[in-house]
Swiss-Prot record:
<comment type="subunit">
    <text>Forms a heterodimer with PSMG2. The PSMG1-PSMG2 heterodimer interacts directly with the PSMA5 and PSMA7 proteasome alpha subunits.</text>
</comment>
<feature type="modified residue" description="N-acetylalanine">
    <location>
        <position position="2"/>
    </location>
</feature>
<feature type="modified residue" description="Phosphoserine">
    <location>
        <position position="180"/>
    </location>
</feature>
<dbReference type="GO" id="GO:0005783">
    <property type="term" value="C:endoplasmic reticulum"/>
</dbReference>
<feature type="modified residue" description="Phosphothreonine">
    <location>
        <position position="54"/>
    </location>
</feature>
<dbReference type="InterPro" id="IPR016565">
    <property type="entry name" value="Proteasome_assmbl_chp_1"/>
</dbReference>
<dbReference type="Pfam" id="PF16094">
    <property type="entry name" value="PAC1"/>
</dbReference>
<keyword id="KW-0256">Endoplasmic reticulum</keyword>
<dbReference type="GO" id="GO:0005737">
    <property type="term" value="C:cytoplasm"/>
</dbReference>
<dbReference type="GO" id="GO:0080129">
    <property type="term" value="P:proteasome core complex assembly"/>
</dbReference>
<feature type="compositionally biased region" description="Basic and acidic residues">
    <location>
        <begin position="28"/>
        <end position="38"/>
    </location>
</feature>
<protein>
    <recommendedName>
        <fullName>Proteasome assembly chaperone 1</fullName>
    </recommendedName>
</protein>
<feature type="modified residue" description="N6-acetyllysine">
    <location>
        <position position="264"/>
    </location>
</feature>
<keyword id="KW-0963">Cytoplasm</keyword>
<comment type="similarity">
    <text>Belongs to the PSMG1 family.</text>
</comment>
<feature type="modified residue" description="Phosphothreonine">
    <location>
        <position position="18"/>
    </location>
</feature>
<comment type="function">
    <text>Chaperone protein which promotes assembly of the 20S proteasome as part of a heterodimer with PSMG2. The PSMG1-PSMG2 heterodimer binds to the PSMA5 and PSMA7 proteasome subunits, promotes assembly of the proteasome alpha subunits into the heteroheptameric alpha ring and prevents alpha ring dimerization.</text>
</comment>
Amino acid sequence: MAATFFGEVVRTPCRAGTEEEEEEEDGNRETPEDREVRRQLARKREVRLFRRQTKTTLEVSLLEKHPCSKFIIAIGNNAVAFLSSFVMNSGAWEEVGCAKLWNEWCRTTDTAHLSPTEAFCVFYHLKSNPSVMLCQCSCYVAEDQQYQWLEKVFGSCPRKNMQVTILTCRHVTDYKTSESTSSLHTPFLKALKTQNFKEPPFCSLLEQPNIVHDLPAAVLSYCQVWRIPAVLYLCYTDVMKLDLITIEAFKPVLSSKSLKCLVKNIPQSTEILKKLMTTNEIQSNIYT
């Protein structure tokens, strides 16, 4: 800037600044190659639902093809192991779909035989009562994929006469409290429910200012918007890998209306859980 004799301030042209702006504009200009890479990446990140048995893609949302009255969703390794041991072991379940996901944290597997250490998102219904559905999701669903997941699973106009139960875990350091987290007895359960969920939850409600994250939050928000009765049981733990004590912290939920009729033999299920943990330890041991 420069000042005239009359005190007027005028701008002097600066070629350096202009050149920098031009270089910045050139850098921001998208090339056809950039657009193609972006299209391919977006295509790769699309959430797809398909039948592994037939390798066919589902053309409609999962719940349009398989209407349900109860939908139980386990998200994360410990919640998945809980359903595998205590619910899926108590009845004959049939796979009805599988989500294919690709993102920075997850590559879902297409194999028919899944282990607890693999990333997968599989849907089942109960053979004796197909209106009861279950989802085991051990993989990470990125923020830009959550809406796609909801659309592919629930559809654009979901049924309101169903009840959704969500099980998941968070590390105890995410729990906000006036107490020291070291004084908390972990693991422990907290619940969060939609306005239309009228049953009393089997643990205390999650207090403010605590919030839920990722896919569990997306599912609960979706149910709240569409007035679907839904409850989220959130287990706070200090062990995020597959852990027997964390898995058993979900046991109070077995008394809920959604799960009570699905569980037959808890002692036998506990033994199956212990075998599952042993198998996982063997698979995780680099020396075997």
